[in-house]
């Protein structure tokens, strides 16, 4: 029979059409079958898939297909995280509506996903910008409001004073509005919040349940939640400031209380605003703070600035006066907006005190068993030690002092122990257009009420014109006008943070077509929690934390009965590619696509020379960097599919690096993956006639030769390794390497007897089955070519034959004085005496021990015999 040619484009289109016709990956609940829900983070429909998507979704698809072959009822859905600011920007640039741009992108990217052979149940597809999705989000928000978990308060935003609009952080460039160029101001406006802090302790303690999450992600969430044990302390003012007589601070170091020499408050603290009325320099300082947005992460590195309020607080234990300062490192949104300052034992406070000439007092010294320098003229002493200069608390260590000082404060009515969290409530208001409208109504009396459920969804108009200045729904007064109980009302014109949509999409997939409810609890509880979640570590905190929070809210609404949404998490690494640029006289870099650059490499594959194809002139090599539009070094997946086929991309992305590490996109590696696929194809085609499925004999385990046993052992060791690598360890690269190694063994396999053919057939079928999750198109065809009537998608994962792993014989290395002198084959159960006798009988061994005394014999069972002689 003429050899069948490997034509990836033809094969892949044929197989994909068959999957679609047969609805191969459609999932239904089957109570008698163990389920497996595999989910990859859904993409933002930006226009085209990038290689980061391809890697993410290939991992998810490999896991899904593996679990399906292992008898699980697998759900693997896909959808679109479709709201967000980029659509507004693209709509402006392309003079179109965000909705139209988004839906066009979804159509294109969906075809790309199909062309890569991902086994999704497309009947469960969701797009978060469609009203049948966000209506339930709106409904759920109103339920949270009714439960007291939603509230409205003023919060600071970036305000463009020229365009009179709120800007996202990404729209502020060097402190100016991206469109107007005006200096951005900080402005307080009312916004909606959800009380995630009510769940802070549960979100923290339930991290212990997530044993199959990367430790790094759990640590990041733990730090973000930021549980601390401390003391709330009340400082009275020496004189009332308007109607303010005292204020509270929170500290985790009450042991340093006697070292307080000043207190610092935020620029927006009521005390600061009161004092500024009579102190122009303070008013000016507050104004400068107001127009400088400070992220919490920047506090440690920013320049510390402050201004004296002229007010004094009374130390709660000593009765001494301490100055009240306004400081730019105190944020009103965190804690009470006031901190006690201990410059002797806090480096930030020390730097501030040095700058403004404030007193520095030592109240902690190193313990006797920890000799350390404690020179407060050079830096604060920040370690926990033993108290000094602290009245009756002198000599106490940290925990004793903590408890004793807290008890005294409590007895005086000046403080109490408190557990605090760094986590802040979730502000869900966005002053953008392309998002789900927040389902609240503002009444004439100033009250806010939820939109009645029978009036949901509050629909976002899609046929709009963007002007880049103001949201179309804010610009249209008629859209906001409505009634509530016969009285005039105005709709909320803010939209939800897009993290709202991505916080519960995993659950909607369970009953995506349900028009009558957010979730069907029966379906949701069958599929949830997600067994395997795949996505980038950049989502470790916000998305994954909000999603965990949402799951608990869904549970408390009776919609799901589990505590956590995702059992196992895999965070894939970034995809890197070579980058190339030229720098002009001003230092500005122009980046060129790798496809437009010719390179010369040394013997180690390092680029030594790069020239632009267009003009033949040199360009600089910027190294391997994350594929990005800014560096112009993205590789279009479609180009690789057209060149090599989807299976080649899939094999390369699985083989080139461990999944959690960065993957370097190297053309030679892609070519290598393609050669491997062709080798599998050719080996199978070369042996199809000899391995006819109808006439091939069965393996007779009792009549196998040594070579046949060796080959079967290699096959079943590979099955065991690949099963473990894919299922438990998720080291897909080593799984592919093991299949490659087995393939090398098969190239030399004999096929002269029926048993040779039977063993070889088992081996080749095993290769096809093991490779199927990774290169499913080719394996689908080869499975049929091997004579199988059923599709490989219904074939079980190959089982390990434990008897094949048993070795009848062992190869023993024989050394004399640590140097290899011979190799011998012995029975697997041979004793040390038998091995030693056979080893010493070898001619090459004898010549190195003749005339010498054997001092010692070292035997490592089944592996090595070392004879020590002199």
UniProtKB/Swiss-Prot annotation:
GO terms for cellular component: cytosol. It is found in: Cytoplasm. Its main location: cytoplasm. A motif ('KMSKS' region) lies at residues 626-630. A motif ('HIGH' region) lies at residues 43-53. Pfam families: Anticodon_1, tRNA-synt_1, tRNA-synt_1_2, tRNA-synt_1g. Its EC number is 6.1.1.4. ATP binds at residue 629. InterPro entries: aa-tRNA-synth_I_CS (IPR001412), aa-tRNA-synth_Ia (IPR002300), Leu-tRNA-ligase (IPR002302), Leu_tRNA-synth_edit (IPR025709), M/V/L/I-tRNA-synth_anticd-bd (IPR013155), Methionyl/Leucyl_tRNA_Synth (IPR015413), Rossmann-like_a/b/a_fold (IPR014729), tRNAsynth_Ia_anticodon-bd (IPR009080). It catalyses: tRNA(Leu) + L-leucine + ATP = L-leucyl-tRNA(Leu) + AMP + diphosphate. GO terms for biological process: leucyl-tRNA aminoacylation. Keywords: Aminoacyl-tRNA synthetase, ATP-binding, Cytoplasm, Ligase, Nucleotide-binding, Protein biosynthesis. GO terms for molecular function: aminoacyl-tRNA deacylase activity; ATP binding; leucine-tRNA ligase activity. Belongs to the class-I aminoacyl-tRNA synthetase family. This is Leucine--tRNA ligase.
């Amino acid at each position: 029979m003429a050899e069948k040619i490997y034509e990836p484009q033809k094969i892949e289109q044929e197989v994909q059409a068959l999957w679609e016709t047969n609805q191969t990956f459609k999932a239904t609940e089957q109570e008698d079958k163990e389920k497996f829900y595999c989910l990859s983070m859904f993409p933002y429909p930006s226009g085209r898939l990038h290689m980061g998507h391809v890697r993410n979704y290939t991992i998810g698809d490999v896991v899904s297909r593996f679990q399906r072959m292992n008898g699980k009822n697998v759900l693997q859905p896909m959808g679109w995280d479709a709201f967000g600011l980029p659509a507004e920007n693209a709509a402006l640039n392309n003079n179109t509506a965000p909705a139209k741009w988004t839906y066009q992108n979804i159509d294109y990217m969906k075809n790309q996903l199909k062309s890569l052979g991902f086994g999704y149940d497309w009947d469960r597809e969701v797009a978060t910008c469609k009203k049948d999705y966000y209506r339930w989000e709106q409904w759920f928000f109103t339920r949270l409001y009714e439960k007291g978990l939603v509230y409205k308060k003023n919060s600071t935003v970036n305000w463009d004073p020229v365009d009179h609009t709120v800007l996202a952080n990404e729209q502020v460039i060097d402190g100016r509005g991206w469109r107007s160029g005006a200096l951005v101001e900080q402005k307080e406006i009312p916004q909606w919040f959800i009380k995630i802090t009510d769940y802070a302790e549960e979100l923290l303690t339930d991290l212990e349940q997530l044993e199959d999450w990367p430790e790094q992600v759990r640590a990041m969430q733990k730090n973000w939640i930021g549980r601390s044990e401390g003391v709330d302390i009340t400082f009275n003012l020496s004189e009332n400031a308007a109607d303010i007589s005292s204020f509270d601070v929170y500290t985790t170091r009450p042991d340093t209380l006697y070292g307080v020499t000043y207190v610092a408050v935020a620029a927006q603290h009521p005390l600061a605003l009161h004092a500024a009325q009579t102190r122009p320099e303070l008013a000016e300082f507050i104004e400068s703070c107001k127009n400088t947005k400070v992220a919490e992460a920047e506090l440690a590195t920013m320049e510390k600035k402050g201004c004296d309020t002229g007010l004094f607080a009374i130390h709660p234990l000593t009765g001494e006066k301490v100055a009240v300062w306004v400081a730019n490192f105190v944020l009103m949104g965190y804690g009470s907006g006031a901190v006690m300052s201990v410059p002797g034992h806090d480096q930030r406070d020390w730097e501030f005190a040095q700058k403004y000439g404030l007193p520095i007092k030592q109240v902690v010294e190193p313990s006797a068993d920890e000799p350390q320098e404690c020179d407060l003229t050079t830096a604060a002493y920040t370690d926990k030690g033993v108290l000094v200069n602290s009245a009756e608390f002198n000599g106490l260590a940290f925990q004793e002092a903590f408890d004793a000082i807290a008890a005294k404060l409590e007895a005086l009515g000046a403080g109490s122990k408190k557990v605090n969290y760094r986590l802040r409530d979730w502000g869900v208001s966005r002053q953008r257009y392309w998002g789900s409208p927040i389902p609240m109504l503002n009444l004439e009396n100033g009250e806010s009420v939820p939109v009645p459920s029978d009036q949901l969804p509050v629909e976002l108009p899609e046929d709009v014109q963007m002007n880049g200045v103001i949201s179309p729904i804010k610009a249209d007064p008629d859209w906001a006008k409505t009634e509530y109980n016969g009285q005039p009302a105005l709709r909320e014109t803010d939209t939800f943070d897009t993290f709202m949509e991505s916080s519960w999409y995993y659950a909607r997939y369970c009953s995506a077509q349900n028009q009558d409810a957010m979730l069907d609890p029966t379906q949701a509880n069958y599929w949830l929690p997600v067994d395997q979640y795949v996505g980038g570590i950049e989502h470790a905190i916000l998305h994954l934390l909000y999603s965990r929070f949402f799951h608990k809210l869904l549970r408390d609404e009776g919609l799901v009965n589990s505590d956590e949404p995702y059992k196992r998490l895999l965070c894939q690494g970034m995809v890197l590619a070579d980058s190339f640029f030229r720098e002009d006289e001003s230092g500005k870099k122009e980046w060129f696509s790798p496809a437009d650059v010719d390179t010369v490499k040394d013997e180690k594959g390092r680029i030594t020379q790069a020239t632009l194809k267009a003009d033949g002139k040199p360009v600089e090599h910027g190294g391997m960097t994350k594929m990005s539009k800014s560096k112009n070094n993205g590789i279009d997946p479609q180009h690789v599919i057209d060149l090599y086929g989807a299976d080649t991309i899939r094999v390369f992305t699985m083989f080139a690096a461990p999944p959690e590490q960065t993957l370097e996109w190297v053309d030679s590696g892609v070519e290598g993956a393609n050669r491997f696929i062709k080798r599998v194809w050719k080996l199978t085609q070369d042996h199809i006639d000899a391995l006819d499925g109808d006439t091939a004999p069965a393996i007779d385990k009792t009549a196998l030769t040594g070579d046949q046993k060796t080959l079967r052992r290699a096959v079943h060791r590979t099955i065991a390794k690949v099963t473990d690598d894919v299922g438990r360890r998720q080291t897909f690269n080593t799984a592919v390497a093991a299949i490659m190694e087995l393939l090398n063994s098969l190239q030399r396999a004999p096929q002269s007897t029926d048993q040779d053919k039977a063993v070889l057939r088992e081996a080749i079928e095993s290769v096809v089955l093991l490779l199927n999750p990774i290169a499913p198109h080719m394996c689908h065809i080869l499975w049929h070519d091997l004579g199988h009537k059923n599709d490989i998608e219904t074939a079980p994962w190959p089982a390990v034959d434990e008897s094949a792993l048993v070795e009848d014989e062992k190869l023993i290395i024989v050394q004399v004085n640590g140097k290899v002198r011979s190799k011998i084959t012995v029975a697997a159960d041979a004793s040390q005496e038998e091995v030693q006798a056979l080893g010493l009988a070898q001619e090459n061994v004898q010549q190195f021990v003749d005339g010498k005394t054997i001092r010692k014999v070292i035997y490592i069972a089944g592996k090595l015999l070392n004879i020590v002689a002199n």
